[in-house]
Amino acid sequence: MTIFGIDISNNNGPDIDLAQVAREGFRFVFAKVSEGDRFADHTWPAYRDAAHANGLLVAGYHYLRGDADVEGQADLYIAHLGDAATMVDFEADSGDLSTFWAFVNAVNARGRQINLSYLPRWYWQRIGCPDVSTVPGLIQSSYVYGSAPAAALYPGDDSPFWTGFGGKNVDILQFTDAAVVAGHRVDANAFLGTLDQLRALLGLAPSTTQGVLMALTDAQQADLYEKVQEIWGQLRGPDGQGWPQLGRNAQGQNMTLVDAVAKLQQDLLSAPKATS
């Protein structure tokens, strides 16, 4: 199966409705935490908490800068990350692979394991095509043209965009920077596998939800529950005690909608037939 997610930061503004993102079928959010050794993204805490509240898997990323102190960058990142999976954004101006590993090791030394690495093929080529076989959770980016809902833009599970490099398979593909999601244009990602496989990639325990509902987010399950309750109420009446306006049955109880329809059918069938 293919699972879709989004990638956001302060560049997208603070007002993306993650409840709507979940309703549109997305299952994960990657959002910016920090950059270099000074910048903390002000949108991160709210997006992190909203992702959790709406059943979306969430990872927070640090944009690694090759011109800033690695230890200071790790300190800043960990200070602002909180309860989320970890991700390194390693691209333009991030330095070479030695800088990448220095940051990964610095984060690991602070008690967190890096789960994901955004390292697009073009940047890998720019730094000399090194071996990246041990890079955790490779996210590669190649963009399709146009702007539309993410599923309409997705190039497919067999797209060459998924081709690995540097001795590493691609774990997640960022395939557009112009997906229309919850009324915003954002980066969209795809993961090939189950939700539990994605959770494992993010260093999270398997879901405890079993059966058909495990394909739904917490927000979608809540929405489904509300709809079922509404349907039950319309059929059975308030508290399941029938509707006073539909009349009473032979036992003096308020009739439900089904009772009333059955009574109406019985009355119609027993009514005298018109003669010509």
Regions found by a protein language model. Give the residues of each.
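Heptad-repeat coiled-coil amphipathic alpha-helices that mediate oligomerization/assembly
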Residues: T209-T275
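Short, well-ordered secondary-structure micro-motifs
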Residues: E71, L97, I127-C129, A151
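Functionally critical loop-and-helix segments that line ligand-binding/catalytic clefts
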Residues: M1-A19, T134-M214
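Short, amphipathic alpha-helical "lid/cap" segments that border enzyme active or binding sites
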Residues: V70-A74, L195, Y225-V228
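Substrate-binding cleft of extracellular glycoside hydrolase catalytic domains
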Residues: M1-S117, V135
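Aromatic-lined carbohydrate-recognition surfaces of secreted/lumenal glycan-active proteins
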Residues: R112-Q125, Q140
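Short, aromatic/basic amphipathic alpha-helical patches
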Residues: A50, A102, G128-V132, G156-F161
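Positions that flank functional sites
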Residues: G36, G66, W122-Y123, V180
